[in-house]
From Swiss-Prot:
Keyword terms of this UniProt record: Chloroplast, Plastid, Ribonucleoprotein, Ribosomal protein
Organism: Euglena gracilis
Name of protein: Large ribosomal subunit protein uL2c
Basic residues composition-biased segments: 255-277
Taxonomic classification: Eukaryota, Discoba, Euglenozoa, Euglenida, Spirocuta
InterPro entries given in the database record: NA-bd_OB-fold, Rib_uL2_dom2, Ribosomal_uL2, Ribosomal_uL2_bac/org-type, Ribosomal_uL2_C, Ribosomal_uL2_CS, Ribosomal_uL2_dom3, Ribosomal_uL2_RNA-bd_dom
Length: 277
């Protein structure tokens, strides 16, 4: 991925940067692998706003991504690498020997023409999928399952990866993208390699309108509102919030309040918290 930087001819192009999409090999998606999804725009089923910072944005077709690599033992070939407006990673179109086609998350260094396979004893090669208990220690993986058979849920964003640290008994120790060290069941599946589009974090939007294209609305601070709109609002000039601790618009503690339950069943699987990194 190559990033193109704009010259500061206007305030909208100053510090603006975009990807040049050099890795994209096909512009139009497979028609039968896409469908339209009605976007909630931050509202619930009654039309009431439940998330004030979502809404608008360009229309999108959702691509069916194969997070659960269940075509066991069937060789697949990479036909194209495509842009997906629903995620920051690229997607790869795979053609299988049985005639099926599907999309997968595009790993870094997977090229058009490469072959991939999903099996219990797949070779350790980028794009191949197998149980994490069969993967050597230190290997970088992505699209990792939390629960066996549920499909990949961990490390699906651009540039993310998981690393295997230990393999003992019923569990495998991994390092999460956040730095958290935790245990996973040995029967969970994963895909070899790191998610592509590594430089996505270096892209600068440059103007507010570009954020609106993505469906994000402005986030207004509570202290900038009136007292009828937020507990932090009101006052003369630049005044403090007038409370011992910050709260949400509905008066509940915010900014530092712990939200994870100390009795959560999965706490026993966390060896080192991400906050200790």
């Amino acid at each position: 991925m190559i990033i193109r930087y704009y010259k500061p001819y206007t305030s909208g192009t100053r510090k603006r940067s975009v990807s040049n999409f050099s890795e994209i090999t096909k512009s139009n998606p497979e028609k039968y692998l896409t469908f339209f999804v009605h976007r909630s725009k931050g509202r619930n089923s009654r039309g009431v706003i439940t998330c004030r910072t979502l809404g608008g944005g360009h229309k999108r077709l959702y691509r069916r991504i194969e997070f659960k690599r269940n075509k066991l033992g069937i060789l697949g070939k990479v036909i194209s690498i495509e842009y997906d407006p629903n995620r920051n990673a690229r997607i790869a179109l795979i053609y299988y020997k049985n005639g099926d086609k599907s999309y997968i998350i595009h790993p870094f260094d997977l090229c058009v023409g490469n072959n991939i396979i999903s099996d219990f004893f797949s070779p350790i090669k980028i794009g191949n999928s197998l149980p994490i208990s069969k993967i050597p220690l230190g290997t970088i993986i992505h699209n990792v399952e939390f629960e066996p058979g549920k499909g990949g849920q961990i490390a699906r964003a651009a540039g993310t990866f998981v690393q295997i640290l230990a393999n003992e008994g019923k569990f495998v120790t991994i390092t999460m993208p956040s730095g958290e060290v935790r245990l996973l069941r040995r029967y969970c599946w994963a895909t070899i390699g790191q998610v592509g589009n590594l430089d996505h974090s270096n892209v600068v939007l440059g103007k507010a309108g570009r954020n609106r294209w993505l469906g994000n609305k402005p986030t207004v601070r509570g202290v900038a509102m009136n007292p009828c709109d937020h507990p932090h609002g009101g006052g003369e000039g630049r005044s403090p919030i007038g409370r011992p601790k910050p709260v949400t618009p509905w008066g509940k503690p915010a900014l530092g309040k712990k939200t994870r339950s100390p009795k959560r069943f999965s706490n026993k699987y966390i060896i080192r918290s991400r906050k200790m990194v």
